[in-house]
Amino acid sequence: MNLSELSPKDGAKKRRRRVGRGIAAGQGASCGFGMRGQKSRSGTGTKAGFEGGQMPLYRRLPKLKHFPLYNPKHFTVVNVGKLAGLAPNTVVTLESLMEAGIVTSNDGPLKVLGNGELAVALTVHAPCSKAAQAKIEAAGGSVVAQG
């Protein structure tokens, strides 16, 4: 057996429909297009969404804006109040927060937000909001913003 000798099984391929070759051929006369009308004429017919002259649905509905991002960037978010339980002079990174049990899953880069109170001096190695940075520096800590 060679590749050149291969052929499909009997009945695996349907015969092409030959229209307009006489009534006895089965698809003569109107060739399966019915009697009259736009869809029986030659040419491409109607465009997608055409409703016979009626205002189509896609034009009746309002235009919607502000679709959500298809591939948004996710962050692991921690508020300043959660960092209050850490020991003084701790270096705060995503890895150290996972070891301490404050963060349970890595959803992306760490971002510190300003909700809550902080009285412990910490060194934060992550991007912070302005409110979070003010609270960390007011407690005697420092922020090394990355990214």
From Swiss-Prot:
Q: Where is the composition biased (Gly residues)?
A: 23-35
This molecule's function is given as: Binds to the 23S rRNA.
Instruction: Give the NCBIfam families listed for this entry.
Output: rplO_bact
Record GO terms (molecular function)? rRNA binding; structural constituent of ribosome
Which SUPFAM superfamilies has this protein been placed in? Answer: Ribosomal proteins L15p and L18e
The keyword rRNA-binding is annotated on this UniProt entry:
yes
A GO biological process held by the record: translation
Please provide the record's keywords in A-Z order. Ribonucleoprotein, Ribosomal protein, RNA-binding, rRNA-binding
Q: Which family does it belong to?
A: Belongs to the universal ribosomal protein uL15 family.
Q: Which InterPro entries does the UniProt entry name for this protein?
A: Ribosomal_uL15, Ribosomal_uL15/eL18, Ribosomal_uL15/eL18_sf, Ribosomal_uL15_bac-type, Ribosomal_uL15_CS
Q: State one Pfam family annotation.
A: Ribosomal_L27A
Under which name does UniProt file this protein? Answer: Large ribosomal subunit protein uL15
UniProt-annotated stretches for the region Disordered? 1-52
Q: Which organism is it from?
A: Synechocystis sp. (strain ATCC 27184 / PCC 6803 / Kazusa)
